[in-house]
From Swiss-Prot:
Protein name in UniProt: Protein-arginine kinase
Catalysed reactions listed for this entry: L-arginyl-[protein] + ATP = N(omega)-phospho-L-arginyl-[protein] + ADP + H(+)
Family: Belongs to the ATP:guanido phosphotransferase family.
Cystine bridges: none
GO CC list: extracellular space
HAMAP family: Prot_Arg_kinase
Record comment: activity regulation: Appears to be allosterically activated by the binding of pArg-containing polypeptides to the pArg-binding pocket localized in the C-terminal domain of McsB.
Function: Catalyzes the specific phosphorylation of arginine residues in a large number of proteins. Is part of the bacterial stress response system. Protein arginine phosphorylation has a physiologically important role and is involved in the regulation of many critical cellular processes, such as protein homeostasis, motility, competence, and stringent and stress responses, by regulating gene expression and protein activity.
EC number: 2.7.14.1
InterPro entries: Arg_Kinase (IPR023660), ATP-guanido_PTrfase (IPR000749), ATP-guanido_PTrfase_AS (IPR022415), ATP-guanido_PTrfase_cat (IPR022414), Gln_synth/guanido_kin_cat_dom (IPR014746)
Amino acid sequence: MSLDKIMNEAISPWMKGDGPDSDIVLSSRIRLARNFKQYQFSTMQNEEEAKQIHELFKKKFINKAVGSFGEFGLLKMNELTPLQRRVLVEKHLISPNLAGTEYGACLLSESEHISVMLNEEDHIRIQCLFSGLQLSEALQSANQIDNWIEKEVEYAFDESLGYITSCPTNVGTGLRASVMIHLPGLVLTKRISRIIQVIQKLGLVVRGIYGEGSEALGNIFQVSNQMTLGKSEEDIIADLKSVIQQIIQQEKMARELIVQNSSIELEDKVYRSYGILANSRLIQSAEAANCLSDVRLGIDLGYIKGISRNILTELMVLTQPGILQQYAGGPLGPEERDYRRATLIRERLSIEKN
């Protein structure tokens, strides 16, 4: 696994495929929180204990293959620049919390769809990413990695409670399942607030694109379970999948309603956004995200021909501040970022059209 490859290829291999319901569901993620019995929680550990966990993983798991996942490499946060850490966050390979830790690290698969974060809130957090609605498949992969690690270490586990975690809401299965979902129809019809209220009453959480505390840029929301105690992994997945399928139906109905009642207004909105993307010389990340959302909707509804939906997904990643600066070879001021973002979008759309 090459750090240069990770940094220079903004689109992870797992993002290039189209999973089920990929017109609305961008990705599915499974995260398993685990702690080692012999160490204090990450929030209480000292430097020596953190280094011991690094060495344990370096000895037991680095450059070793498991199943069809290929070999894993280790990235230590204190060996990366702030910009490199930001790129990993923008590619959803690590959490913002891990990026801010001194003794954190990440075990990463060649395909980048599996990462094992070390010394975050818990000793390890296994993350599996799949395109589209593939929660069961992601859980299966996460369990394979979990079993692989558990052969070499002893987890903190209680027979009555389950896996012991730093945060009480993760005690039990330690499972956090989440789905990244694009909901422009519900936003445009002003139904999104009511939908979010219903989701929250069902015990689920709605966040922005980078998880807790982040903003829902480009009409993209992250829906996940909240409690992990008292339910099996399969039940958690089934409940979340059921809710997501209902949201998908609500989004499709909202899109149909807009087409029926406001078709010309929607078409105008889509093409105005396309015009901004295709012609702007300066564009901020929030405006780019909103315009990309409009154009993606236009592609899904058949207004715009000859442009792949995947290009929009690619541009959503490529135009993030960290990745833009990585491509530029170093830090950029806000206006320089806006200029490069606009240039990149124009060039990419021009290539796609031709």
